[in-house]
């Protein structure tokens, strides 16, 4: 049986830098799955509808940027190899969401948020800090974050124009994936965060959504 490769701290830092560039540079993330929107018919949206949907998808794209950074930060400081591997696998799966959202934003004639580098840095720091405290807290943070993302996606699904099948297909698949990530994190030993902590996280997420809807 081949032995598991052990990376040096320098190797891991280079891997983190590569992950950051693949997350932040346009069209650099290569999805492993085709977009759920691929076979859906493009709706005839009014200018205001297209602008609103683009704003929603921009929020979701930035949310995926934050998820990438969170997972990469946690993978850097995770104590147990299996937790580190789980974080890296989750980050790989989120690349699909990142690419799908960006594709849809471009189709709508809009742009990703210029604030993404800032949110990436903040989320990476939070993820690394959680990993330093304990793997249980790190996994619990993943579960709580994914629960927040699911709530945002439910809200956005309710705001989409009825005929926008492309955006709806993307968000529905993302919703399914994020719920699975949350469940997997708890089953792996993640701590269930109390309601006050989740409330604080929701306030922080509102800052992100307000800021990235337009810019």
Swiss-Prot record:
The gene is coq7. This is 3-demethoxyubiquinol 3-hydroxylase. Its main location: membrane. Fe cation 1 binds at residues 64, 94, 97, 178. HAMAP family: COQ7. Signal peptide: none annotated. Pathway: Cofactor biosynthesis; ubiquinone biosynthesis. GO terms for molecular function: 3-demethoxyubiquinol 3-hydroxylase activity; metal ion binding. It is an enzyme of class 1 (oxidoreductase). It catalyses: a 5-methoxy-2-methyl-3-(all-trans-polyprenyl)benzene-1,4-diol + AH2 + O2 = a 3-demethylubiquinol + A + H2O. It comes from the Bacteria. Disulfide bonds: none annotated. Belongs to the COQ7 family. Catalyzes the hydroxylation of 2-nonaprenyl-3-methyl-6-methoxy-1,4-benzoquinol during ubiquinone biosynthesis. GO terms for biological process: ubiquinone biosynthetic process. Binds 2 iron ions per subunit. It is a peripheral membrane protein. Its cofactor is Fe cation.
